[in-house]
């Protein structure tokens, strides 16, 4: 694994399945059934493969632990391997559900400045916004 530096992280910085990323992709709350939610994704840093997503109440710092555990288990089932580390934007606390769930599988969790994850976040946000735009046009 290459040592990360303050620059924007890129897929070329990683090997497949050594590092996963978890982050919120919506820039504004999503209104579903009169409730505002945030959408979090789990992604492989090298391949950019999206393992899946979970929802959280808008304004909370992370999804519920059960959702995160299911998401991580589903990703593990697809790769039959745990990553070495999980990157989260910012400085996640020990109460963060991603920190707790990853720790159960001895996956190291590392907080990084959100700006270093911008390559991934922007790409996923653009795809998400394109999808929403095409879905709204079909309705």
Regions found by a protein language model. Give the residues of each.
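Secondary-structure boundary/capping micro-motif
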Residues: 1-139
């Amino acid at each position: 694994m290459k040592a990360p530096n303050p620059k924007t992280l890129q897929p070329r910085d990683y090997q497949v399945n050594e590092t996963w990323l978890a982050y919120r992709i919506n820039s504004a709350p999503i209104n579903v059934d009169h409730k505002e939610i945030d959408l979090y994704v789990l992604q492989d840093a090298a391949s950019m493969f999206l393992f899946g997503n979970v929802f959280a109440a808008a304004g909370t710092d992370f999804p519920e632990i059960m959702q995160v555990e299911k998401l991580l288990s589903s990703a593990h089932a697809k790769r039959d391997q745990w990553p070495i580390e999980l990157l989260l934007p910012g400085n996640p606390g020990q109460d963060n559900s991603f920190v707790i769930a990853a720790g159960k599988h001895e996956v190291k969790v590392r907080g990084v400045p959100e700006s270093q994850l911008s390559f991934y976040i922007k790409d996923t946000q653009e795809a998400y916004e394109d999808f929403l735009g095409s879905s709204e046009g079909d309705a």
